[in-house]
């Protein structure tokens, strides 16, 4: 389960920001997860709870924002929304797509004290 390692890294980032920005508690974390990133939101919630236990984010809410996948179709020269990596262009059916969004995993916002 790679979500555990992702959450460990996320907590490290939050703790570093707490030292730099001088906050002592995290109330909420807004996390952007791309639809094409192979990250399970429910596994992230479970792992975040386990990794955050006893630390600065122990009681924090994890709000997950699922970001859609997008690609540039080289056949029809359009940006299109896609649900999976190997999907054809929904407009022209072409398979020459360059992923432009949906792979991200980003802490968007923290609510802190």
UniProtKB/Swiss-Prot annotation:
Positions with a binding annotation for Ni(2+): 2
Keywords: Metal-binding, Nickel, Zinc
Pfam families referenced in this protein's UniProt entry, alphabetically: HypA
MF (Gene Ontology): nickel cation binding; zinc ion binding
Residue sites binding Zn(2+) per the record: 73, 76, 89, 92
Gene Ontology biological-process annotations: protein maturation; protein modification process
Organism superkingdom: Bacteria
Annotated family: Belongs to the HypA/HybF family.
Function: Involved in the maturation of [NiFe] hydrogenases. Required for nickel insertion into the metal center of the hydrogenase.
Protein name as it appears in the record: Hydrogenase maturation factor HypA
Organism: Rhodopseudomonas palustris (strain TIE-1)
Classification of source organism: Bacteria, Pseudomonadati, Pseudomonadota, Alphaproteobacteria, Hyphomicrobiales
């Amino acid at each position: 389960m790679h979500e555990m390692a992702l959450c460990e890294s996320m907590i490290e980032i939050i703790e570093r920001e707490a030292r730099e920005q001088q906050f002592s508690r995290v109330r909420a974390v807004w996390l952007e997860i791309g639809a094409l990133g192979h990250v399970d939101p429910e596994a992230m919630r479970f792992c975040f709870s386990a990794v955050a236990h006893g630390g600065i984010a122990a009681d924090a809410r994890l709000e997950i924002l699922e970001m859609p996948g997008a690609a540039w179709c080289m056949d029809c020269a359009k940006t299109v929304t896609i649900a999976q990596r190997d999907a054809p262009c929904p407009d022209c059916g072409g398979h020459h797509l360059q992923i432009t969004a949906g792979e991200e995993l980003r802490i968007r916002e923290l609510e802190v004290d």
